[in-house]
Amino acid sequence: MHAGVTGGVHRGGKRRLRNLLLGVQLFICWVFISLAAALYLQSDKTGRTLFGTLSLEEKEQILSIPMDFSFMNAVQKQDLIHQFKNLSGVEEVLPADINYLGGVSGTGMYTEKDNKGSYVDVNVMRITSGFFRFMHIPMRSGHTPRESSDLVIDEALSHRLGTDIMGKPLYNFDGDAYTVKGVCQTFVSSVYYDSEGFIFLLSGFDDYCGHCYIKCKEGQAETVFQEVRKILKKTLPESVEVKVSTFMDDIRESQALEFKLRGIVLFFSVVVLVISLLGVYSAVTIDTEYRRKEMAIRKINGAGMRQIVWLFARLYVTLLTVTAVLGFALVEFLLRQFSTLYTVFFQHGVAFYFCLFLSASLFVALTVAFRIWQVSRVNPAEEIKRE
C-alpha cells in the first residue's frame, strides 16, 4: 500500500512538472507568435505610410537608381537619364539630387528678408515640374510651381505658418525671394519623427543630379530593371558597382528594424509552435494512455464524445488561457515601448490578441482532438478485459 501511495505521488509530481514545462513552452509560443504578427503588421503600416500617396504596388513598379558619380558631370548624367526615358517600358523618369529616404536638398528659410529671427526650420526639396504627378501628391490649394521663383509647401508647414501664407514670399539664405503658390498634402518621408514640413522648389538639375527614379509601365518593372542594369554596366567603369532597386526596396532598407526582424522572429515562431504542438501531443498521449480504463468505464456508463473530450481538454484549455494572458501582457508592454519609436503604429487592441488566440488555439485543439479521437475508438469492453 505504501508503495502504491509513493508511486501515485511520484506520478503526480512528474505530471505537474510536465504540465509546468508545457506551460512554459506555450508562454514562449504566444510571445513569439504575437511579436511576429506585430512586426508584419507594423512593417505593412510603415510601408503604406511612407510616401503614402503611392500604393504598395506602385512603389514596387518604381526603380530607384543612385547617380552620385563623382566621375560624371551633369551633362553625362542627363544623357544617362535620357537613355532611361527612351526605354519602351518606362512611363516617366524623375531626377533628384538625393534619395528621398536619405535626406533633403536643404533646411530652413526665412519669412522676412534679412531678419534672422524669422528663420523657419523646414525641409527643402528641389523637384522637377513632374514631381507631384509622379508621386500622386494632390494639391490642397493653389497650383504646382511653374516658375523658378515659385514654391509649394505641404500641409504640415502650412499649419505652422498659418492659413494666410498663400502668395507670400519666403527667403533663402542668400536673400532670394520665392512666392508660395500652392499647398499640397503632407509629404511623409519618415515614420520616426513628426515632420516640420516641406518646401518644394523647381529645379532642372542642370548643376547636380544624385539620384533618379523610374516609373515603369504595368508589368514592365522586371524588364526595365534588366535594361537599366545593362545601360549602367555599359556606361560605368567596371570598378563601380551597379545598384538598381525598387522604391519599396529602399523603404525596406530604411525600415530594417521591422522588415528584417520580422523574418527572423517568424522563423523562431514556427519552430516554437511546432515544439509546443509536439509537447501537447506527447502530453495528451500520456494522459489518454494513463486514463484508458477510466475512459472505458465512463463510456460504458453512457458518457458521450463531448464528455470524453472535456475530460482531457480542460487541462489544455486552462494552460492555453493562463499562458496566453501572461504572454499577451508581456507583448503588450513590449509593443507600447516599441511604439514610442514611431509616429504611426498599428492597432494592437483586443481584436489583435483575440485573433492570435483563436489562430494558435485552433492548432492545439486539432492536435488534442486528433489524439482523443484515436483513443475514443477503442472498444471499452475489450479495454476493461485487457486491464
Predicted features, each with a name:
Residues 1-11, 278-317, 377-386:
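Intracellular coupling helices
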Residues 1-68, 362, 379-387:
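Alpha-helical transmembrane segments of integral membrane proteins
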Residues 272, 293-340, 351-355, 359:
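Transmembrane alpha-helical interface segments in multi-pass membrane proteins
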